[in-house]
Swiss-Prot record:
This is Transmembrane GTPase Marf. The gene is Marf. GO terms for biological process: adult locomotory behavior; axonal transport of mitochondrion; ecdysone biosynthetic process; endoplasmic reticulum organization; lipid droplet organization; lymph gland crystal cell differentiation; mitochondrial fusion; mitochondrion localization. It catalyses: GTP + H2O = GDP + phosphate + H(+). GO terms for cellular component: axon cytoplasm; mitochondrial envelope; mitochondrial outer membrane. The lineage of its organism: Eukaryota, Metazoa, Ecdysozoa, Arthropoda, Hexapoda. It comes from Drosophila melanogaster.
Length: 810
């Protein structure tokens, strides 16, 4: 076996002559002395187990010429196609079911909002899974700190220096390397379809260049598939900026890592794992379920300078990496973690493969001693990487999607079963509802006729009561009109312009006062009576329509923003517009005043005696009139006998009085002298002078007392008589108007309630008509639910077959 190992090493180094046997033996001794935990010891153990197959895999040229048909990655390709087909059926099924559930929710409240949202969430969930499954490749993402050699590792696996690498921060954006069908390499920037020469990657992705891209931007590099077997099998490499460059790790993961199948953490073997590197993969493990992670301790060639502490450092790094994968991330067990930690030199491997491409032996690219071990370790990483993809990718990726597909179909089937049961119950409820509606409509029509008769009678009685109360209250207020007018305190002046304003304000005062007094006496009681009647109407109508929605509608129509208020339209401005005051001074004991006072009494007697006179004229007797009981001496000034006066009309009597007064006024001087002469001869001059002096004093007193106050009192007295006469004329009209307002209020309320009941009855009739159609729809829904349940069973059977063919044999 030692000879086999020496021969394999010689094939790698290019030295096969016997002169190098000592060197080969020295190399073998180095392998033996490296200890059981070293990479070469692990490689030696693997060699002894796998024999010549392992030796063939160690040859760098062998993987370049592997047949694509025999690649283990083809299992993944076939499985991916099958699971994509199944998920296409699942997506169609989920869309069909969700559309049906949404329509069912709109037609009848069988499905609640939470269930409907859950069905809709399956649409997005399946679409997200399909988006991952429909990729044409597997993605491998490389992460690590700045200048740890991520780009160098990808270049070594691609066997050419494609990505920028070197000292310092080299990769400033995400670079995605994927296979192209053509023989030329090109690149495309994010948001552009222009194909650029791959040489320009140094100008687009290098941080040292003036024209640099954003850290989260993506540059896609298309490399010929035939130049790398991994690209030929649709594997994509993603190079990233250093995790310590930007704090936007969540954006990086969301934009570039959610669909990654394998993550490679590239560490610097000269230092320990940093918090930034750990934090990034902690975030990845939170967003992805158990990601596949490989850890490469790069730049291990630096350990050749300190061979005495090489093993202790390696053991320390290995232990920390295993603890990170098992205890912190919990993505693998210790055995799997130990198989995913490697110590390599990417730069050295890249140089060796470049020399190999030139036809030179690989060892010409060696940087330090121990090249063979590091080179074998890198080959071991590539082999384990392919095995992980071919053996684990299908299981870790598709098994989860298969289980989720079963879970989706199973959950939907269970929910559909529950909905089917609820529809059955709902159908029974609909049938019972139909029977209840029929009975309710018949009872409503009968009770509606009875309530209408009772409410009409109640409105009629209330209207009569209101008319009587308003008439009585208004008459009482008219009787107290003098008190109301005395309360008016506006300054009075007999000037015509001022007097017109005074009358206008007095009319407004009377109208306001009467209205206020009537409202104080009647409005509260009337409003309470009206509200009580409306409440009774509403309660009676609500008893006819117990539906909550109709009750709310009728209540909204009846409720007023303000209580009912009676409007008393007196309109004193127009009513007393014909009032004409008489503010001229009149001596109360003057001849004209005496005549007017006498004629006034005569008018009163004539008004009282006029009906008797009419009766006497209409009686059969007509011949002789009965003598008057009033003696002639009671009216010495009147020149006509009482029977004649009793037969004179008021218009004729007024004309006679005016003529007498005017005659006396025109002949006052002569008449006065005649009367004075007669009285002088009859009673003597002393008595006449005394009476004249007394008469003059009385006249002078009344004349001096005729002030604005006296004029105002006279004006108000005249206004009271005039307003009382006018207001009594509208008592019946006002009371009728108020009763009409009450009638309108109650009638409109009852009419609205009747319309509400009629609407409810119409709705119930319409509901009866729609119940049969709803029952037919429910039957159709039950048939559709059965069909959807059968489709769910079919999908579960398809997933069982997929697991048996692709997941169980693995």
């Amino acid at each position: 076996m030692a000879a086999y190992l020496n021969r394999t090493i010689s094939m790698v180094t290019g030295q096969t002559g016997p002169a190098d046997d000592d060197r080969h033996a020295s190399s073998t001794d180095t392998v033996d002395k490296s200890g059981p935990g070293s990479p070469l010891s692990r490689f030696n153990s693997s060699l002894q187990q796998s024999g010549s197959t392992m030796a063939a895999n160690l040859l760098p040229e062998s993987r370049l010429y592997q047949s694509n048909d025999k690649s283990p990655l083809q299992i993944f390709v076939r499985a991916k196609k099958k699971i994509n087909d199944i998920y296409g059926e699942i997506e169609e099924y989920v869309h069909e079911t969700t559309t049906f559930i949404n329509a069912l929710h709109a037609e009848a409240e069988i499905v609640d909002k939470a269930e409907r949202e859950l069905f809709e969430s399956y649409v997005y969930k399946v679409a997200a899974i399909r988006e991952v499954l429909q990729r044409d490749h597997m993605k491998v993402a490389f992460f690590g700190r700045t200048s740890n050699g991520k780009s160098s590792v990808i270049n070594a696996m691609l066997r050419e220096k494609i990505l920028p690498s070197g000292i310092g921060h080299t990769t400033n954006c995400f670079c995605q390397v994927e296979g192209s069908n053509g023989g030329e390499a090109y690149l495309m920037t994010e948001g552009s379809e222009e194909k650029l020469n791959v040489v320009n990657i140094k100008q687009l992705a290098n941080a040292l260049c003036q024209e640099k891209l954003c850290e989260s931007s993506l540059v896609r590099i298309f490399w010929p598939r035939e130049r790398c077997s991994l690209l030929r099998d649709d594997v994509v490499f993603v190079d990233s900026p250093g995790v310590d460059v930007s704090a936007n790790l969540d954006d990086w993961i969301d934009n570039h890592c959610l669909n990654a199948d394998v993550f490679v953490l590239v560490l610097n073997a000269e230092s320990t794992m940093t918090r930034a590197e750990k934090q990034f993969f902690h975030t990845v493990s939170q967003k992805l379920s158990k990601p596949n992670i490989f850890i490469l301790n790069n730049r291990w060639d630096a350990s050749a300078n300190e061979p005495e502490c090489q093993e202790s450092v390696k053991s320390q790094h290995t232990e920390r990496c295993i603890d990170f994968l098992t205890k912190e991330l919990k993505v693998s067990n210790e055995k799997e973690a130990a198989e995913r930690v490697f110590f390599v030199s990417a730069r050295e491997t890249l140089q060796a493969r470049i020399e190999e491409a030139k036809g030179n032996p690989p060892h010409m690219g060696a940087i330090a001693e121990g090249f063979q071990i590091r080179y074998f370790e890198f080959q071991d990483f590539e082999r384990k990487f392919e095995e992980c993809i071919s053996q684990s990718a299908v299981k870790t990726k598709f098994q989860q999607h298969s289980s989720r597909g079963k879970s989706v179909s199973g959950d939907m089937k269970s929910m559909l079963d529950n909905i089917y049961e609820r529809i059955t119950i709902f159908r029974n409820l609909k049938q019972d509802q139909k029977n209840l509606l029929t009975e309710r409509i018949q009872g409503t029509e009968t009770q509606m006729m009875q309530v209408t008769r009772e409410m009409k009678m109640k409105i009629h009685n209330m209207v009569e009561e209101v008319e009587e109360k308003v008439s009585k209250a208004l008459n009482e207020e008219i009787w107290r009109l003098g008190v109301l007018i005395d309360e008016f305190n506006m300054p009075f002046h007999p000037e015509r312009l001022v007097l017109n304003i005074y009358k206008k304000e007095l009319n407004a005062h009377v109208e306001s006062g009467l209205g206020s007094n009537l409202r104080a006496r009647l409005s509260m009681a009337l409003a309470m009576n009206v509200e009580s009647a409306q409440t009774e109407m509403t309660d009676r109508m609500h008893a006819l329509v117990p539906n909550e929605q109709l009750l709310a509608t009728s209540t909204k129509m009846v409720v007023r923003t303000q209580p009912f208020e009676m409007l008393y339209s007196l309109n004193c401005q127009n009513l007393c517009a014909d009032f004409q005051e008489d503010l001229e001074f009149k001596f109360s004991w003057g001849i004209a005043a005496m005549i007017q006072r006498f004629t006034g009494k005569v008018r009163e007697r004539s008004k009282k005696g006029q009906p008797a006179l009419v009766n006497r004229q209409s009686s059969i007797g007509h011949s002789v009139s009965t003598p008057t009981t009033t003696p002639v001496e009671a009216t010495p000034v009147c020149l006509l006998p009482a029977p004649v006066v009793a037969g004179i009309t008021p218009e004729q009597l007024s004309l006679i009085s005016r003529f007498a007064v005017s005659s006396i006024g025109s002949q006052g001087t002569v008449g006065g002298l005649v009367v004075a002469g007669v009285m002088l001869k009859t009673i003597g001059w002393r008595v006449l002078v005394g009476v004249g002096a007394l008469y003059g004093c009385i006249y002078l007193y009344e004349r001096l007392s005729w002030t604005n106050s006296a004029k105002e009192r006279t004006f108000k007295s005249q206004y009271v008589r005039h307003a009382t006469k006018k207001l009594k004329m509208i008592v019946d009209l006002t009371s009728a108007n108020c009763s009409h307002q009450v009638q309108q209020e109650l009638s409109s309320t009852f009419a609205r309630l009747c319309r509400t009941v009629d609407t409810a009855t119409t709705d119930m009739n319409d509901e009866l008509k729609t119940l049969d159609s709803q029952l037919n729809i429910l039957e159709a829904n039950q048939k559709q639910l059965k069909l959807l349940r059968n489709k769910a069973n079919y999908i579960q059977n398809e997933l069982d077959i997929f697991e048996h063919n692709y997941i169980s044999p693995q």
